[in-house]
Amino acid sequence: MTDKFAEFLKIASQLNKMGIVPLLMGSLGLEQVTGQDWQARDIDIHVHGDERGWEAPDEERIYDMDKIEPMMDRLGYRFVDLHEHEFQKEDLSIEFGAMETLEAFSGVSIAELTRKEVEGVEFLVPTADQFLAIYRASSQDS
């Protein structure tokens, strides 16, 4: 288990205690699906949020931010960017996104994501094919 994945599990465990099952995205999520090291530089976590995504005001985009921010603070992270909903601890960056934007953005339905449990921690992760659809949409969005 990589250090970043262990850190994700620590955060996801706290989210689970708040009734939140997070979606692990980005390179770290892809590592869990493929078993390959994609050299994740950060941790991308999606939770429930406004389906308007970037169109929604920063303060309203991520639901339960009023609970997530103090939880991250207790874990030693500092809130550094409201627009990206980014937290940092030393050289590690955690960014929160809204999972409700996924289907409109990439065609991937939240209902079709894979639910996993590792060390008693529940989280969602896309399949390899879903990651491909997400990365294709990202490349066209840039």
Positions of PLM-derived features:
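Compositionally biased terminal segments of proteins
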Residues: 1-142
